[in-house]
Amino acid sequence: SFIKEISMKTETIAAIASAMTNSGIGIIRISGEDAFDVIDKIYRPKKGNKLLSQCKSHTIHYGHIYDEDEIIDEVMVLLMRAPNSYTREDTVEIDCHGGTLVMRRILEVVLKNGARPAEPGEFTKRAFLNGRIDLSQAESVMDVISSKNDFALKSSMQQLNGALTGKIKEIRGKIIHEIAFIESALDDPEHISIDGYGENLLIIIEKLMQKMNQMIASSENGSLLKEGINTVIVGKPNAGKSSLLNALVGRERAIVTDIAGTTRDVLEEQINLNGITLNIMDTAGIRSTEDVVEKIGVDKALSLVDKADFIIYVVDTSTALDEND
């Protein structure tokens, strides 16, 4: 497994880095020790005949991608030499027209000339293995991409820029400092006294525990921001739950009638409220019922209430409260 890991790391990889949909621009990325050899085989400049492997790092070049003598597309090519790239490897980025067929054809040519298809997340994996980012930063890359609101994006960017890493390093540094003091005292008890040190150590440990608990709480809050707050609308039948859902999403998502028990299954929608994502679920009206289908809906509603982050309880003020409330 270790030998396979080393082998995979030295191979040159390639993938389509932009969305696989028709758009103005597409991006194909190549990374590895043979990246410049691969691009030399398939790229010809618009003017001159200088090989890209002879060009400086962080330069952009205009020309065409060829499959032998056939022009595939007109492109811009960005060169990044190791270690000054995302993966800390030689990296080539081909900016082409954004048609899905064009991107696939260019990738096929790249693979035919010495690269292999990248595995999902392999560029970020290499950035981690090569020491460009740590584990928390590697995790935050996908969080940035999948951010559903401004708060999640800000939190992910802070983590990507090393905010979490800095806090962990600070705690680790203090622990190492105390361990070093204890070891020194054990090695040289005549000159280093640990009288009364136990009480001070407990105070230090308590403070570090407080910091770690704050980080854990912050992580849990961050998860809510990233994934969205699961919000369940509950109440008796005909209390106005579906009308509230429609008002929140700004369209008629749920059927609204005067007949009680119209909503049988769970209706889910997602809205952004002042930068916070709410995963809203409209549920069946909660009441005692002999209807088999409606009872399944009521059971689902009660199950969602137990798992909800936030509950909106809807009451019809025109009627008196009863046992179903």
Where in this protein do the model-derived segments appear?
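A glycine-rich (often HGG/GG-containing) alpha/beta subdomain
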Residues: F2-K154, Q158, G162
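Residue-level signature of catalytic and energy-coupling elements of molecular machines
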Residues: I28, I94, I182, M212, ...
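Short flexible coil/turn linkers enriched for glycine and charged/polar residues
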Residues: T21-N22, E68-I72, N84-E89, L135-S136, ...
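Glycine-rich, N-terminal phosphate-binding loop of Rossmann-like dinucleotide-binding domains
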Residues: G98, L248, T283, V315-S318
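Long, non-coiled-coil amphipathic alpha-helical linker/lever segments
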Residues: R132-K211
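Conserved C-terminal guanine-recognition region of P-loop GTPase G domains, centered on the G4
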Residues: D299-D325
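Switch/connector loops and helix/strand junctions flanking conserved nucleotide-binding motifs
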Residues: F36-V38, M103-R104, R287-E290, A320-E323
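Conserved G1/Walker A P-loop phosphate-binding module
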Residues: I42, D188-K295, K300-V305
